[in-house]
Amino acid sequence: MLIIISTPIGNLGDITQRAAHLLAQADIIACEDTRQTRKLLSLLSISSSAELWAYHDHNGAKVRPKLINVMKAGQQVALASDAGTPLISDPGYKLVTACLENDIPVTAAPGPTAPIVALTLSGLPSDRFSFQGFVPQKKKAARDALEESHLLTMTQIWFETPKRLAATLKMMAGIYGNRYCVIARELTKLHETLYRGMLADLAKQFEVAPILKGELVLVVEGADKHASQVSIEKITELLRTRMHKMSLRDAVEEVEDLSGLPRKQIYQLALSVSKNET
């Protein structure tokens, strides 16, 4: 069996009794960094005889089959990240998929996860949201990711590093427009801080006084459904790009989700694009 276990994102008091019990009972703990997990077990006074196996992006393909084999043999594996919930910006989902393909049971001991904590503290709408993970490191890839998401009408959640924060906020302001943003730093820790303001203002603030360290979560206001900035030209370009790699119907559905515009209007534009391309 595979058990996905959430660990504290800062405050050790956030570990659940069930998570602590399962960590103590596991035969193997698969984790990002064995040193960090060993330290966490010690700080939480969890006595465990489990083997600690490193499992991360760089060794996942090699370690995954070994984990599958030990679970097939009846051993219990706990999957834990350094902080928070596994599978959120880590390779854990590939292990879950492999378990399902091999009829290995999978369950979870839920708990803290930074994106949800930041969202609940942001004051932005939480009925619909999109978690985007880390902003890509390369400038072009970052710009492409922001262009791809700028029409989303739901609240967006991103991870970012202090070093790149000001540049990312400036790029967001240029692509998204000057939206409201909340930056959460060191969540649940002693120096937990939330910065609130418009993207352009926050970009200027952190150019002058950068954050030197700490894990950051950016919660950004979604696009206005009725914003005039959503031009026909932009929608047409989105359709054209997608219709090169998917059916007209699928392209219409995806652009409808991105833009919030009526399906009928998008469908007519898609027909026009299709006609012009032939």
Locations of regions flagged by a protein language model:
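Glycine-rich, flexible N-terminal cofactor/catalytic loop recognition
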Residues: 1-56
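Short active-site oxyanion
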Residues: 23-29, 103-107, 155-156
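Conserved helicase motor
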Residues: 54-61, 135-138
